[in-house]
């Protein structure tokens, strides 16, 4: 029994893909699902104007804009491994949702556009991985286009992201001259053939770079490959498993996701080298996946995944023990026992009921408003998983309702959307206006769109003169005094926490100076 339990855990690989918008993240997601047999045909994203939309972009607004605005989870099996792939929003503005998704994975795949190199969003996301020492594997995409020199790209990754690169494959040419890749460790040459099934022509094993067979196969391009690899041997780092697992080194693959080329090499290396479920920190101790008692945490709430059901799903990462359908668990924040009768697993839009699940798995728990982001569930022990933050918003808008009869629906919509963590809502201590706060501007459009389509509420925004927010705490007597004096700038967020909204950085600094006994917080752990 124990052996089976451990085997199940060891076969799990839970990871997310990070990239800058348009680097090819959705495409590579689909190709991975193709190899896992989870989809039959890649819903080519650029054909999204046709009837089929990329499998992982399922919300109406994403379909219209062609960007992933919500993280979704996809599970598939490949070579006896159970793979949980968390898709993250590729758009600049969704850093908060992406950040929380990165708390639920054990490793990350970074996709880089060979034409553009490292871009701002990738840099931001990598800093988050760095905080958690998350292992990172890299796929340099779009080799079928004229891009930057491969050595130049490695240098860009190393200097910009401050991480060692260990190339695993090496491209032969690029753009119109792209012939394929040479595997530096298995000594295999794989040919690129856009007409062939999955973009991959034959793979030929050679006896190293001096093999005369290479001259026959590559003609004039063989010297270029030999020179590159010779340079690499002096300049690049050999792959070291320990350095990769510590987040200090990234193995690098080259390919063309749109042509499915290089994706299988990446996947084969990934399942063998990426870590299985890892131990997790709680406020009191470290929890190990092999512990028998079940535990885990919610990292995301998604409303209305199925318009027919008007439902809310809590995305839950299992950290220890085994989940079985109908089991009773303790909801730590509420201090009460609940039964999880109908948990689901995801394949983007498709959901199936789950009978059992193991550490590393992401399950969906139906939620009628009682589960919040960051909630811990256990089989009794009083644990609280840490590191799932809310960020202080940087942009604010006042919501003006167009139909006064809809104020209840507006409140319901705003509170539910805030629970998902996409935006934050604030109600003033004095007055009744709703203020929406967001980390990125695109989130305002998402809120309006979803209010109208999912809650049937028509509203508009009005500008407000706030630039930043801080959650405030302190001892009761001081807080009472602070509330009285600063009432015009004080708001309660969706969870009832007190927040101070400032019209300028100077105003915030000044208030903090005047109220030294009050603590001002730029982030807040989900309570």
From Swiss-Prot:
<dbReference type="InterPro" id="IPR031157">
    <property type="entry name" value="G_TR_CS"/>
</dbReference>
<dbReference type="InterPro" id="IPR032090">
    <property type="entry name" value="RF3_C"/>
</dbReference>
<dbReference type="InterPro" id="IPR000795">
    <property type="entry name" value="T_Tr_GTP-bd_dom"/>
</dbReference>
<dbReference type="GO" id="GO:0003924">
    <property type="term" value="F:GTPase activity"/>
</dbReference>
<dbReference type="GO" id="GO:0016150">
    <property type="term" value="F:translation release factor activity, codon nonspecific"/>
</dbReference>
<keyword id="KW-0963">Cytoplasm</keyword>
<dbReference type="InterPro" id="IPR053905">
    <property type="entry name" value="EF-G-like_DII"/>
</dbReference>
<feature type="binding site">
    <location>
        <begin position="87"/>
        <end position="91"/>
    </location>
    <ligand>
        <name>GTP</name>
    </ligand>
</feature>
<feature type="binding site">
    <location>
        <begin position="141"/>
        <end position="144"/>
    </location>
    <ligand>
        <name>GTP</name>
    </ligand>
</feature>
<comment type="function">
    <text>Increases the formation of ribosomal termination complexes and stimulates activities of RF-1 and RF-2. It binds guanine nucleotides and has strong preference for UGA stop codons. It may interact directly with the ribosome. The stimulation of RF-1 and RF-2 is significantly reduced by GTP and GDP, but not by GMP.</text>
</comment>
<dbReference type="GO" id="GO:0005829">
    <property type="term" value="C:cytosol"/>
</dbReference>
<dbReference type="Pfam" id="PF22042">
    <property type="entry name" value="EF-G_D2"/>
</dbReference>
<feature type="binding site">
    <location>
        <begin position="19"/>
        <end position="26"/>
    </location>
    <ligand>
        <name>GTP</name>
    </ligand>
</feature>
<keyword id="KW-0342">GTP-binding</keyword>
<dbReference type="InterPro" id="IPR005225">
    <property type="entry name" value="Small_GTP-bd"/>
</dbReference>
<dbReference type="GO" id="GO:0005525">
    <property type="term" value="F:GTP binding"/>
</dbReference>
<keyword id="KW-0547">Nucleotide-binding</keyword>
<dbReference type="InterPro" id="IPR004548">
    <property type="entry name" value="PrfC"/>
</dbReference>
<dbReference type="GO" id="GO:0006449">
    <property type="term" value="P:regulation of translational termination"/>
</dbReference>
<keyword id="KW-0648">Protein biosynthesis</keyword>
<dbReference type="InterPro" id="IPR038467">
    <property type="entry name" value="RF3_dom_3_sf"/>
</dbReference>
<dbReference type="InterPro" id="IPR041732">
    <property type="entry name" value="RF3_GTP-bd"/>
</dbReference>
<dbReference type="InterPro" id="IPR009000">
    <property type="entry name" value="Transl_B-barrel_sf"/>
</dbReference>
<dbReference type="InterPro" id="IPR027417">
    <property type="entry name" value="P-loop_NTPase"/>
</dbReference>
<dbReference type="InterPro" id="IPR035647">
    <property type="entry name" value="EFG_III/V"/>
</dbReference>
<feature type="domain" description="tr-type G">
    <location>
        <begin position="10"/>
        <end position="278"/>
    </location>
</feature>
<dbReference type="Pfam" id="PF00009">
    <property type="entry name" value="GTP_EFTU"/>
</dbReference>
<dbReference type="Pfam" id="PF16658">
    <property type="entry name" value="RF3_C"/>
</dbReference>
<protein>
    <recommendedName>
        <fullName>Peptide chain release factor 3</fullName>
    </recommendedName>
</protein>
<comment type="similarity">
    <text>Belongs to the TRAFAC class translation factor GTPase superfamily. Classic translation factor GTPase family. PrfC subfamily.</text>
</comment>
<dbReference type="GO" id="GO:0016149">
    <property type="term" value="F:translation release factor activity, codon specific"/>
</dbReference>
